Curated annotation (Swiss-Prot):
The keyword Transmembrane helix applies. Belongs to the ATPase B chain family. The keyword Translocase does not apply. It comes from Geobacter metallireducens (strain ATCC 53774 / DSM 7210 / GS-15). This is ATP synthase subunit b. InterPro entries: ATP_synth_b/b'su_bac/chlpt. F(1)F(0) ATP synthase produces ATP from ADP in the presence of a proton or sodium gradient. F-type ATPases consist of two structural domains, F(1) containing the extramembraneous catalytic core and F(0) containing the membrane proton channel, linked together by a central stalk and a peripheral stalk. During catalysis, ATP synthesis in the catalytic domain of F(1) is coupled via a rotary mechanism of the central stalk subunits to proton translocation. It is found in: Cell inner membrane. GO terms for cellular component: plasma membrane; proton-transporting ATP synthase complex. The gene is atpF. One of its GO terms (molecular function) is proton-transporting ATP synthase activity, rotational mechanism. The chain crosses the membrane at residues 14-34. The lineage of its organism: Bacteria, Pseudomonadati, Thermodesulfobacteriota, Desulfuromonadia, Geobacterales.
Length: 206
């Protein structure tokens, strides 16, 4: 739409000087023809040539003006096109800058959000590590207490067992020593008497 308007303005600026030029040439031709008709009655060749030369000069000057006007019109059109292109490029650059700033703000927000999430994750990991550390320490203490209790119970049982064994051994040794002492102290008559008493008691039981 903008290019069509520019072309229309350019065509209008060219047509106006061309129309003026055509009108001037037409008037010059008519004047020259009229003078030529009058010259048939009273011929003045020198004056006609001089007038013709001036008309040629006028025509050349007019043609130069027309060419200058056309070039100026083309220059204005080219300048307008260049201005439009520059304005378009500036608009596109501004739009690109706005889009880049929008993207930058968007990515900055995402980066900030990601940093916050990373901080939260790091804090959660540290908290979980502290809880795990405390749990491991508590389990280690509980295990150590159980081991100490088991060791104490085992030691106590071993002590009781050793005491029982020592008592049994002491009783056995005491019996052996008593038997030996009796053997040494009891005479043959006492042995026979003890045997007879034992047999009598057995018979009485039956």
């Amino acid at each position: 739409m903008a290019n069509a308007c520019k072309k229309k303005r350019l065509l209008k600026s060219v047509m106006m000087p061309a129309a003026v030029c055509a009108a001037v040439i037409g008037l010059s031709a008519l004047g020259f023809a009229a003078e030529g008709g009058e010259g048939a009655h009273h011929v003045d060749t020198g004056k006609q040539m001089k007038d013709f030369m001036w008309r040629v000069i006028d025509f050349a000057a007019l043609l130069g003006v027309i060419i200058w006007a056309l070039k100026k019109a083309n220059a204005k059109g080219a300048l307008a096109d260049r201005t439009a292109n520059i304005e378009k490029a500036l608009r596109e650059a501004e739009e690109a800058r706005a889009a880049a700033e929008k993207k930058f703000a968007e990515y900055s927000g995402k980066l900030e959000k990601a940093n916050l999430e990373i901080d939260d994750i790091y804090a959660a990991i540290r908290k979980e590590a502290e809880l795990e550390k405390e749990r491991i320490i508590a389990e280690a203490k509980l295990t150590a207490d159980k081991i100490r209790e088991q060791a104490a119970a085992t030691a106590s049982q071993e002590v009781l067992k050793a005491k029982a064994e020592l008592r049994g051994e002491a009783a056995r040794l005491a019996v052996q020593m008593a038997e030996q002492s009796l053997r040494e102290n009891i005479k043959k008559d006492d042995q026979d008497r003890l045997v007879n008493d034992y047999l009598t008691k057995v018979e009485n039981l039956h």
